[in-house]
A protein has these predicted regions:
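Conserved catalytic alpha/beta core of Sir2/sirtuin-type deacylases, generalized to analogous enzyme cores
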Residues: 1-238
Length: 238
């Protein structure tokens, strides 16, 4: 009954706003961010036991390991994101929304939505592991990293990237870092264009019959999807 109701709402809507979060990926088996599974153990290698890591987020935000060890895990995780299969949840959603007027806002950083939807229909609110930025940041630019990720993964030694190979900013020489939300997350020109495209879609359809479809959204960062969706559902006429 719930599935039939969802199909009915999708068919009746003039516009569909999808808010996709980590539950979308977890439902497809991508749980290494939060769990100690085989994927995480491959990413961490010997560092799992050396530092007592339990999952990728635990390792990513840890402060006690070397920079080379830190980068080894980032590189392996990002390489996995490039090589892994497309999640079934994303394939199913693409089928449901085929031919519909929709837009997707996501807090996911794993680029799974880009496997099944066009980039101009997606805004990644919390960044994307496929890009790097200056860690300062000294300038407003993000960099695609696929070629470097695959090259550097082959140069990891004993679960650490040699210090001399750590990616550096081409302008100031500081370390690069993944373009994902953190203390130095770059919300520059690229990010603003992404957000404005999303906000323009909302503005254009604020008086139309709009379906807000919240998928896999928890309470870790409710300010990005859950709370705005609740406010718009309450305020918009249809």
């Amino acid at each position: 009954d719930t599935i039939e109701l969802l199909k009915k709402k999708i068919d009746e809507a003039d516009a569909i706003v999808v808010g996709g979060a980590s539950g979308m990926s977890a439902a497809s088996g991508f749980v290494f961010y939060y769990q100690n599974d085989a994927v995480f153990r491959q990413i961490a290698g010997s560092l799992e036991k050396k530092y007592g890591f339990h999952n990728f987020f635990d390792a990513f935000y840890h402060q006690g390991h070397t920079r080379g060890e830190h980068w080894a895990m980032i590189l392996r995780e990002t390489k996995y994101l490039y090589e892994c299969q497309t999640g079934e949840t994303y394939i199913d959603l693409a089928e449901l929304l085929q031919g519909k007027n929709y837009y997707i806002a996501t807090t996911n950083q794993d680029a799974q939505f880009y496997r099944t939807f066009p980039a101009d229909k997606i805004t990644c609110i919390q960044g994307d592991f496929r890009y790097w930025q200056c860690s300062v940041p000294c300038h407003d630019q993000i960099y695609e990293n696929k070629a470097q990720v695959f090259k550097l993964c082959g140069q990891i030694e004993n679960d650490a990237l040699p210090e001399k190979l750590i990616p550096r900013c081409p302008h100031c020489g500081a370390e690069m870092e993944p373009w994902v939300r953190g203390y130095h997350f770059l919300q520059g020109d690229f990010y603003q264009k992404e957000m404005n495209r999303y906000l323009d879609f909302l503005k254009r359809h604020s008086s139309q019959k709009t379906l807000f479809l919240e998928l896999g959204v928890g309470m870790m960062t409710p300010m990005f999807i859950k709370e705005p969706f609740m406010n718009m559902v309450y305020q918009w006429p249809q």
